[in-house]
Amino acid sequence: MKNSFYILLLVLLFSSCNEYQKALKSEDITEKFKLGEQLYNEGKYSKANRLFEQIIPKYRGKPQAEKLMFLNANASYEMEQYYISGYHFERFVSAYPNSEKLEEAMFKSAKSYYQLSPIFSKDQEDTVTALEKLQTFVNVYPESKYLAETNKLVKELELKLEEKAYSIAKQYNHVSDYQASIASFDNFIIDFPGSSFREKALFYRFDSAYQLATKSVEYKKEVRLQTAKSYYTTFKKAYANSEFIEDADKMYNDIEKQLEKYNTKS
């Protein structure tokens, strides 16, 4: 009985494979579409995708093309081929602006780019693209069923950009390029006013300004000490109980001590 079951299973598998290979070689686009949709519904996206790609050009302009293009894009999405799915969903949105699948296609196009977004330490071009597409989606569908997920994705991507900008500024501080560090932290503070990195950004901007001032040639020192002092004031006003306050106070006291000689001269 058990042997009969395995034999039957092998026959069915062989028959299925034979049917698929036959469809691949066939000129019958209806047969390809029918089998492709069946395979898609069974979760066999790679095989379905291969059949769909063969017949898409031949269905262009026909009523079935809308469904075919969506299934093809979604098959790539389900296979985690996000560059391909993002591209195909974009084409679908452009080709079928009145489709009942438009909302889902636009969301999955944006989410494809979200999936392509790398860790914060790498280039963030795909992160920026994903944010733009997610924002466009929210603008078009402000009450979408995907809105909660979209907002979550946006927050995650924005945090990644914050981390990237902060890490660049902090790296300048680490390698003693203090002017670049100050400029980068200035931009960070303006671009991300509510960031969780704001406390650190204000402190390390002050630290960079202090290091720059104390290591400056004499004729630049006084102005730079005054600038560093102003950064200290901003930091302390915002974070009087910061974990960095002790270090900040030490640097501030040193600044005051160094400024005394300029006050004496005047």
Model-identified regions with their sequence ranges:
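Sec-dependent signal peptide recognition
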Residues: K2-L8
